[in-house]
């Protein structure tokens, strides 16, 4: 909980059990420490996930239990996505980006990718490229090669959904990526609101493309391409709570619109999987959901990290986040290796 929440006399309404169960209590039932659990079980909400972390969990442990297992697949030509979802001020940017003292999932993932890559370099030649973009007010902008140009989403028959004109920087060490992360995050749109002093006003997407081919490949060779997308979503907002006016309110409305579109896609994918149906999924309702199309319903391994705020004033937002995360558990994707066949000409 934030200090300002404690100063207002707010209480924690969330408990973690056995590292995978989240219990959400109704604030009206939480009167003192003795009555936190079990007073009125009809109002308690319980959700089971693969892992549940409290506020004291080290960054490295979060990475190890959510993302580390994806790295080997990316190096072998499979797509993966990790995205942090939740209300504003719930710690999504800290989880994904972190800081110099406590790096988040983005940097820890890249360290692991380069570490595992070394074990394959005897018989493989790798190329690693990085891109970093933001979606701000439904406009896509490059966070590395900064300009006022708004980029377009395109449907590519081989790459799937991609961003036309987005820069991709070849990198050779995780430190290079960390420098790009810090630089790109400085270019990201951030403003203070009453709910969050460093509120991200955009969705940020870091993509790592890992290409490799066998060193002993002949005239005909295969290039395997794995793509890892690490996404820090802007947080859902309530105008009354954030105190937003003018441009901040417009930003908040666009953030909520894209998150609503994401929620609708999660709901439809959940329904399709539960009922074994193939109803239309409205991916085209926002730039965010178009970009996440493969991650949610296509050729990708995907991890959703739900960031929640445990204070009593955040009950509704926390409940909504947990419900979406619970539905997302039932979404199934179809993962396939990405192979590009190349024929070399001898002259």
Predicted feature descriptions by range:
Residues 1-90, 97-300, 307-309, 338-341:
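P-loop NTPase "switch/coupling" elements that transmit nucleotide state to mechanical/effector output
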Residues 94, 286, 317-320:
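Extracytoplasmic/periplasmic beta-strand context in beta-sandwich domains
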Residues 141, 313-316:
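Alpha-helical elements of the RecA-like P-loop NTPase motor core of helicases
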Residues 184-189, 323-329:
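Charged, low-complexity, helix-prone segments enriched in Lys/Glu/Asp/Gln
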Residues 217, 239-241, 315-316, 331-333:
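Extended hydrophobic-aromatic, low-complexity segments
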Residues 300-310, 319-320, 326:
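Extended, charged alpha-helical "arm/stalk" segments used for dimerization and assembly
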Residues 316-321, 327-347:
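Long, amphipathic alpha-helical segments that form or neighbor coiled-coils/leucine zippers used
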């Amino acid at each position: 909980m934030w200090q300002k929440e404690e100063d207002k006399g707010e209480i924690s309404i969330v408990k973690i059990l056995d590292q995978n169960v989240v219990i959400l209590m109704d604030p009206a039932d939480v009167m003192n420490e003795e009555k936190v659990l079990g007073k009125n079980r009809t109002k308690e909400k319980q959700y089971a996930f693969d892992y549940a972390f409290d506020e004291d969990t080290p960054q490295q442990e979060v990475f190890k239990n959510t993302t580390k297992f994806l790295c080997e697949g990316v190096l072998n030509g499979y797509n993966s996505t990790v995205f942090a979802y939740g209300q504003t001020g719930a710690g999504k940017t800290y989880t994904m980006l972190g800081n110099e003292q406590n790096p988040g999932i983005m940097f820890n993932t890249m360290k692991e990718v380069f570490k595992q890559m070394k074990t394959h370099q005897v018989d493989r030649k790798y190329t690693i490229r990085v891109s970093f973009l933001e979606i701000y007010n439904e406009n896509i902008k490059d966070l590395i090669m900064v300009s006022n140009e708004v980029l377009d989403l395109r449907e590519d028959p081989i790459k799937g959904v991609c961003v036309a004109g987005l820069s991709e920087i070849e990198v050779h060490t995780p430190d290079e990526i960390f420098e790009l992360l810090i630089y790109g995050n400085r270019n990201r749109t951030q403003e203070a609101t009453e709910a969050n002093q460093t509120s991200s006003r955009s969705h940020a997407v870091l993509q790592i493309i890992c290409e490799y081919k066998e060193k002993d490949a002949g005239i005909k060779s295969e290039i395997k391409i794995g793509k890892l997308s690490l996404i820090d979503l802007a947080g859902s907002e309530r105008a009354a709570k954030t105190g937003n006016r003018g441009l901040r309110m417009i930003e908040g409305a666009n953030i909520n619109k894209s998150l609503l579109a994401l929620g609708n896609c999660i709901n439809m994918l959940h329904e399709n999987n539960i009922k074994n149906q193939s109803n239309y999924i409205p991916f085209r309702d926002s730039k965010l959901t178009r970009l996440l199309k493969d991650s949610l319903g296509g050729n990708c391994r995907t991890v959703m990290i739900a960031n929640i705020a445990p204070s009593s004033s955040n009950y509704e937002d926390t409940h909504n986040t947990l419900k979406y995360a619970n539905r997302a558990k039932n979404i199934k994707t179809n993962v396939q290796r990405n192979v590009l066949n190349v024929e070399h000409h001898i002259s």
